[in-house]
Amino acid sequence: LKDLKRLWLISLFVKLILAALIPLSADEAYYWVWSHRLQLSYFDHPPMVAWLFSLGHFLEPFMNAVRWPAVFLGHAAIWVGIKLLQKHLDIEKIRTWIYLVLFSPLLGFGSLIVTPDLPVIFFWLLSLYCLDQVLEKKDLNSYAAFGAALGLGFCAKYHIVLFVPCLLLYLFLEKKWNTVNWKWVPATLITGLLFCLPVILWNYQNDFASFKFQLEHGLERPHYDPEWTISYVLAQILIIFPVVLWAALKVKPANPVRFMIYFAWLPLLFFLGTSFKALVEANWPIIAYPAVFMLAAMHPRMAQWKKYYIGFFGAITAAALVILLVPQFRTLNPKISEPFDFQNLAQETAKYQPLYGDSYQMSSSLWYFSKTPVFKLKDISRFDFFDTLPEAKPAGNKFYLVKHEGNGLPQWLSEQQWTYQEIKKIAPDFVVLEFTRP
């Protein structure tokens, strides 16, 4: 295990350095804003990502090191995976699994970006580890820890609920019901409920708004577009990588680790099914990847095949870092240049107070880079966390709005007799408006 520990520590060090160098994306800045308004949960997502950012507040003087607590937790998931696999696989296969994770575009480079995916991957793997303990030890502590891991996973991202059908399908199809110590199952249910209570309470207090939003966001569209399914399938083949996918499909795991089959393929099949109802974002099945990579690592040829995987995604990762860190390349894509545009915008608009933005992305980024509160103007874009804040409507008789040219204004401004004048244009397509009222 010493070699694996060294690999884990070196890769952690590299991640922490890169995480500090790369500026926060707009979504990350949004979660960072949440961390300055801590709640039991939030409209868009459960609260874990905000809690992790709050732990990093003291690191903000060190570039973008506010990410470090979340990045560390995401990397700790690899160590949990090592502890799970060391009972079942030899060192070489575990090393192969680590490399598959480290060079994965979402589990590797993607783990530098703080989203709800980081904590949910940790608690998904921790739940797998606890399940392995439950099946082996069958004691109260194991069952209680299993429930706690699932409950905390629910505080990270709602996708953790897919763990339950994966487990039930495994117990049913593999005829493993007799391995369950039923007298301790209530301990799992109780600790699971206790540790996900913040999310349950918040939704109860807010008419289950977050649950409704996620269901509508992921499952409801009026008409089917075949491109949803095609893009989902192609994206997953590319992200997992054809050779890795082939190895995972062909391997026949030994009985003690057959549960990996269900935790690998059921989430992928679930989101394949939802692709017939709505567009599926490429990262949604991320919970399946650790088990897919575990299956692939068991294939006798994967130790040799992994060089193609590492070469392909290693080159892409290197190119992404060059594009992010070398200013001349940032203009290749608007999403790449966005954090840098917002960083410049924060400097250009610093003298305009109170300042509002026209989207949660803009407002959050300006707030993060300026360290001065910048709220999104209420109802100027789709409903989000900012619309729940009293500051979303200006209290005085004067304020400033920075927005993208061409974006509209909310109706209530004219109803409240606000008038405005354009006072500044800022590249690439921003405009600052001054609003006043009698």
Task: Label the model's feature ranges.
Residues 37, 109, 142-158, 192-194, ...:
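Membrane-interface alpha helices of multi-pass inner-membrane proteins
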Residues 152, 163-254, 272:
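Transmembrane-lumen/periplasm boundary regions of multi-pass, lipid-linked membrane glycan transferases
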Residues 8, 94-105, 150, 154:
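Short helix- or helix-capping micro-motifs
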Residues 86-91, 127-142, 250-254, 300:
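Membrane-interface transmembrane helices that cradle and orient dolichyl/undecaprenyl
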Residues 278, 305-351, 360-375, 379-391, ...:
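Membrane-proximal, lumen/periplasm-facing interface regions of secretory-pathway glyco-
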Residues 78-80, 119-136, 142-150, 292-295:
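Specific aromatic-rich, kink-prone transmembrane helix
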Residues 106-120:
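Short acidic/glycine- and proline-prone juxtamembrane loop motifs at membrane-interface regions
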Residues 68-89, 126, 130:
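Transmembrane-helix motifs of polytopic, lipid-linked glycan transferases
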